[in-house]
């Protein structure tokens, strides 16, 4: 399975209709949807689809046709995510109607093609399950700890500065956490 770490977009045109597909990390999905509604107030539709792994390891999927004929927009976008083995990803497709009806088959192809075009722009990352890890560091060691975290590729860090030490909460792969534990023992 694969995921991505930033938002990508591509524009596809079919019979004067414009389809702007945005692929994003699922954690950014709701924020991006609100942003697109503000940025594209004249768009006829904003179709969505998503896939993510929940806290108990199940794949959760969903889609919305946003007033397009049922099954012609969100489902085809979701099928592209499934077929490409993408996870923890959302896709949002902004459609501007060009005045020519595409028909149900045309809509299915157009939405699928828009997502596939955006996928060609992406740098996909192999998905690795991430875990939470919490530890403390003295203020004097914090710089060295931060350097080591950066060195092993851990970037999702939350620090709480307490009176005697710093509490660090992070999210990383199992391998990264094991490397960090080995470093902290020394």
Regions found by a protein language model. Give the residues of each.
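Glycine- and acidic-rich phosphate- and metal-coordinating loops
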Residues: 87-97
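Short amphipathic alpha-helix segments
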Residues: 136-155, 179
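Non-DNA-binding regulatory cores of transcription-related proteins
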Residues: 156-174
């Amino acid at each position: 399975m694969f995921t991505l770490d930033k938002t990508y977009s591509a524009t596809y045109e079919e019979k004067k209709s414009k389809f702007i597909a945005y692929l994003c990390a699922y954690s950014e999905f709701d924020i991006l949807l609100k942003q697109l509604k503000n940025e594209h107030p004249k768009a006829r539709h904003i179709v969505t689809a998503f896939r993510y792994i929940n806290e108990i390891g199940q794949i959760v999927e969903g889609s919305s046709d946003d007033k397009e004929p049922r099954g012609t927009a969100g489902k085809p976008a979701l099928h592209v995510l499934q077929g490409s083995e993408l996870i923890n990803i959302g896709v949002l497709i902004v459609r501007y109607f060009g005045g020519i009806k595409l028909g149900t088959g045309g809509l299915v192809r157009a939405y699928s093609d828009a997502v596939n075009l955006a996928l060609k722009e992406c740098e996909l990352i192999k998905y690795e399950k991430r875990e939470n890890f919490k530890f403390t560091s003295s203020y004097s060691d914090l710089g060295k700890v931060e350097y080591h975290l950066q060195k092993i590729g851990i970037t999702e860090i939350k620090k709480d500065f307490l009176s005697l030490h710093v509490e660090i909460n992070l999210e990383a792969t199992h391998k990264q956490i094991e490397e960090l534990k080995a470093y902290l023992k020394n």
